[in-house]
């Protein structure tokens, strides 16, 4: 089989409690910007609670540094493939199966391919391939089928939400900017050279700003009538532009 394109699946970032609360409580984000969910994910290996925003093929999540006992700036970038058996072979990487709990059982969720050792404390990355069994068994009231594409999984996620925006702005994530120390940047760039993802990731030296995610670029499904800026906490700013793009800075 020819190798499938490796795309962005999702990212997460840990923010301070004030920023997390401002994001969680924003009526604009939940009612206009994107499909939103606060959830606790129970896996066989761990559990965690965060807030999620779903696009068409990509999504992203935030963690509260106080609630999850994570450091502000902890970041992960998950890549994904859209076909069974499309996971690449990367020498030295570790492959395992991640499950997700539902109805008192752990359902095979996705296969994960991770660098060994992980990139750094507070910086993770992996490639994921959904299993056909996941959509066949998880929340079947939201649809039928055994699809493994990012779009099919996100469609199921959104279909079981209690409330969804009628016409959300968000289409997908198109790029990330990360600020990393030199050694972490070198390891991340080496990993990306092995993965060869079809998404733009830019790197900045650490300088005086926070570690990890500095900004996210988005493609929008519709344009705001004029440039729109929304702030969350002390330094998190989301800007929507009339050219159907947006940037969220941290």
Can you name each region flagged by the protein language model?
Residues 85, 91-171, 175-183, 196-250:
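Vicinal oxygen chelate
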Residues 2-5, 20-21, 53, 67-72, ...:
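Short, low-complexity cationic-aromatic patches
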Residues 8-10, 48-50, 74-76, 173-175, ...:
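Extracellular structured ligand-interaction cores
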Residues 18-19, 68-70, 83-86, 182-184:
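Short acidic, S/G/P-rich loop/turn micro-motifs used as interaction or catalytic elements
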Residues 54-56, 194-197:
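Short strand-coil-strand connectors
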Residues 2-21, 169-179:
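Terminal, regulation- and interaction-focused segments at domain boundaries
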Residues 21-37, 90-93, 97, 182-196:
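Amphipathic alpha-helical segments
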Residues 35-78:
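Glycine/small-residue-rich interface belts in oligomeric ring/scaffold proteins
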């Amino acid at each position: 089989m020819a190798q499938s394109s490796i795309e962005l699946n999702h990212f997460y970032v840990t923010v301070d409690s004030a920023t997390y609360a401002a994001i969680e409580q924003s009526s604009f984000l939940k009612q206009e910007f994107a499909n939103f969910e606060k959830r606790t994910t129970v896996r066989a290996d761990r559990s965690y609670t965060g807030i999620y925003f779903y696009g068409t093929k990509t999504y992203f999540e935030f963690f509260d540094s106080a609630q999850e006992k994570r450091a502000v700036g902890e970041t992960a970038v998950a890549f994904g493939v859209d076909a069974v058996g499309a996971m690449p072979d990367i020498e030295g990487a570790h492959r395992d199966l991640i499950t997700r709990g539902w109805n008192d059982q752990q359902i095979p969720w996705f296969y994960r391919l991770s660098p060994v050792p992980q990139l750094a404390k507070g910086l993770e990355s992996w490639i994921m391939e959904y299993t056909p069994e996941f959509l066949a068994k998880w929340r079947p009231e939201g649809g039928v089928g055994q699809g493994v594409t990012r779009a099919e999984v996100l469609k199921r996620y959104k279909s079981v939400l209690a409330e969804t925006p009628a016409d959300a702005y968000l289409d997908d994530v198109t790029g990330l900017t990360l600020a990393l120390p030199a050694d972490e940047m070198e390891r991340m760039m080496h990993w990306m050279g092995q993965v060869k993802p079809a998404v733009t990731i830019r790197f900045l030296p650490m300088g005086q700003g926070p570690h990890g995610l500095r900004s996210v670029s988005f493609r929008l499904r519709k344009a705001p009538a004029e440039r729109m800026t929304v702030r969350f906490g002390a330094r998190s700013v989301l800007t929507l532009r009339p050219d159907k793009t947006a940037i969220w800075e941290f």
